[in-house]
Amino acid sequence: MHFPLPQPDVSATFKRRLNRFLGVAEVEGEEALVHIHDPGRLAELLFPGSTVWLRKKAGGKAPYYLLAVELPEELVLVDSAMHNKIATWLVEEGHVFKGYSVAKTEPSYGRGRFDLLLRRPDGGLALVEVKGVTLEVGGVALFPDAPTARGARHMEELARAAAEGYEAHVLFLVLRRRARLFSPNWALDAKFAEALAKAADAGVKISAVKLEMFKWGLKFAGELPVKLR
């Protein structure tokens, strides 16, 4: 089984990024605005001349929505709106959290909203925060690729939940084919990395899985080792 992705409408050549959510691509010989849902920098993916796959978008400033980037050796999903659906599929297929089921999406806890609330086989509940990883350097998948104060706050909330006796998880979806290991990006965002490591010390369970993209779907490619420090 694989996770089906929406069929893109057109391939294009990326030209430049305007801001966090907008870029410009050349589509069939003309420049067009593209909505970018992933807030990361994506500098190693979205550079002038890179091949991108777009979906047509109804309404809003941009007529296109960025789905994926095509590199010489791989396709990389860059639509972060898909992450919760992918994580739900992984649970339902038994690839992660075997025996658990999805009780709720986007549950609230404390001052934060998380991605999934799972029900354990014994009826208990588990909070899960899902993060997508598109940065890979020398076989190491790194998160984040841009500083994320919100991400650090999520880790602190999960640590509090674990300290109060709740089961809590962080699941990293690694979307790079060559990745062999996951690590927080200490060089770029030490605050997030430290918050993640402290969350693990508090009892939050950290895991990473690799997903390989093809036209047009994702296949589960196994768990990756995690190195926090």
From Swiss-Prot:
Molecular function terms from GO: DNA binding
InterPro entries, A to Z: SfsA (IPR005224), SfsA_C (IPR040452), SfsA_N (IPR041465)
Pfam families cross-referenced by the UniProt entry: SfsA (PF03749), SfsA_N (PF17746)
Domain of life: Archaea
Gene3D superfamilies: 2.40.50.580, 3.40.1350.60
Alphabetized CDD domains for the sequence: SfsA-like_bacterial
Family, similarity comment: Belongs to the SfsA family.
HAMAP family: SfsA (MF_00095)
PANTHER family assigned: SUGAR FERMENTATION STIMULATION PROTEIN A
Name of the protein this chain belongs to: Sugar fermentation stimulation protein homolog
Species this chain originates from: Pyrobaculum calidifontis (strain DSM 21063 / JCM 11548 / VA1)
Gene, per the UniProt record: sfsA
